[in-house]
């Protein structure tokens, strides 16, 4: 069931990104891309739509190595779920850290969950709180609301000292534009 939900999330997020592209107007020579948004026909996303997770992982990998934030995030999801690749939380953690460091809210939220559950890393409520807070700052709308709820739920299991430490680390992380978030 988790794999089916993850597949749906991957496909829907890809479709939403593709639909968010506005048509170019004016002189195309003066248009500066703000971010690399995949076109609906790009191979890794088409592979996901077909349910070819192994093929998608193979296509995402070189892009992720070159720094493509969405490829890093999607590869992290595939490794965390074991879809198309052997499940490997350490590798998922690696890709989510890279994407989170580039400001990807989804990857930041995945890091929070991995720290909260101890997946690929020692369970750490302080770091989970930090990444939930950072992801909340990077998100908008309903996803922001859900992330903040998760953070607040985590806070109920923490001491005041842990929360104070987490808030200090969150501030440091945000002020450094995700460069000093206590990650290795």
Task: Please report, for each region that a protein language model flagged, where it lies by residue.
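N-terminal leader/linker segments that initiate helical-solenoid repeat arrays
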Residues: 17-54, 58
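Terminal, low-structured helical/coil segments at or just beyond the last alpha-helical repeat
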Residues: 24-31, 37, 143-184
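Bacterial N-terminal signal peptides
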Residues: 7-16
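Short coil/turn and helix-start
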Residues: 49-50, 65-66, 70, 79-87, ...
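Hydrophobic face of amphipathic alpha-helices that form TPR/SEL1-like repeat modules
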Residues: 40-47, 59-63, 74-81, 85, ...
């Amino acid at each position: 069931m988790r794999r089916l939900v993850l597949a749906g999330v991957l496909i829907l997020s890809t479709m939403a990104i593709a639909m968010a592209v506005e048509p170019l107007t004016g002189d195309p020579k003066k248009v500066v891309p703000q971010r690399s948004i995949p076109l609906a026909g790009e191979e890794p996303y088409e592979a996901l739509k077909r349910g070819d997770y192994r093929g998608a992982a193979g296509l995402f990998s070189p892009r992720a190595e070159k720094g493509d934030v969405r490829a890093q995030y999607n590869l992290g999801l595939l490794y965390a779920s074991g879809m198309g690749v052997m499940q490997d939380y350490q590798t998922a953690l690696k890709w989510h850290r890279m994407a989170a460091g580039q400001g990807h809210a989804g990857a930041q939220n995945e890091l929070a969950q991995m720290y909260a559950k101890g997946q690929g890393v020692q369970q750490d409520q302080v770091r989970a709180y930090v990444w939930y807070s950072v992801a909340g700052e990077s998100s908008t709308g309903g996803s922001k609301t859900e992330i903040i709820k998760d953070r607040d739920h985590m806070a109920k299991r923490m001491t005041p000292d842990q929360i104070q430490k987490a808030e200090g680390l969150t501030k440091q992380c945000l002020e450094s534009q995700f460069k000093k978030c206590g990650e290795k």
